[in-house]
Amino acid sequence: MIYDVLEYGAKGDGVTNDAAAIQKAIDACSQAGGGKVLLQGGHVFRSGTIFLKSNVEFHLEMGAVLKASDHLEDFDMLKVGTPQISKVDTPTYNACDYNGKPTLNFVYSKDAENVAITGFGKIDGNEKIFYGKVTKWHIDGYFYPRVPLLFLENVRHLTIQQVTLTGSAFWTTHLVGCKEVLIEGIRIINNLRLANCDGIDPDHCSNCLLYTSDAADEEDS
């Protein structure tokens, strides 16, 4: 079954924060046993944090853009340094300079299964609102909070296909403790002057298959 976010109140006008409408569609899809949450082409959906849930395919049609909000208050905050992970020994983020996991998240999932992000649309992290000091050659990356584009914890049977991921202010695809992962045919296009906008970071994951994907980013493709 298809759950079109426009039918759940999303505007797709590039201005309105559509997070609540998108989340409503995701919740309805998961609660009904699963299906496809659709973002139609020709629309820009501005959004704060969204939570992907079990048995949901999050599908962006060609020409659809999910773009991070300009306002930090639209992103849900996690407690820095608080144990949040399930069934993972020591995630890499525990050793990061910011002393814990990312405090803010854009596209997030935790303790879920059968999650997919698909389609030829685009997810844009709106990097410019997170810039530190900008010089001729470099943009300071040692400032927080910054928002990773995709942050997925303890997700089993995870698929990411075809989508373009761009404008990430921090790690683009951070997978923590995920199992049975397929990443295929995606494009990652980030600012080569912005520090720490890694491409794909499998962190304590198992059975990951990554292929036929392109990444242009400043660090750790």
Q: What positions do the PLM features span?
A:
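Acidic Gly/Asp/Thr-rich repetitive segments characteristic of extracellular carbohydrate-active
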Residues: 5-39
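N-terminal extracellular ligand-recognition/capping segment immediately after the signal peptide
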Residues: 9, 34-83, 93-103, 122-123, ...
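Short, T/G/N/S-enriched strand-turn elements that build extracellular solenoid repeat scaffolds
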Residues: 26-29, 46-53, 171-177
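Right-handed parallel beta-helix
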Residues: 27-30, 104-107, 124-174
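Extracellular beta-strand solenoids
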Residues: 39, 52, 60, 68, ...
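All-beta strand scaffolds that present successive hydrophobic residues in beta-strands
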Residues: 58-61, 116-119, 158-161, 181-184, ...
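Acidic/polar low-complexity surface segments
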Residues: 68-101, 124-149, 185-199
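Conserved small/polar residues in nucleotide/adenosyl-binding loops
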Residues: 211-216
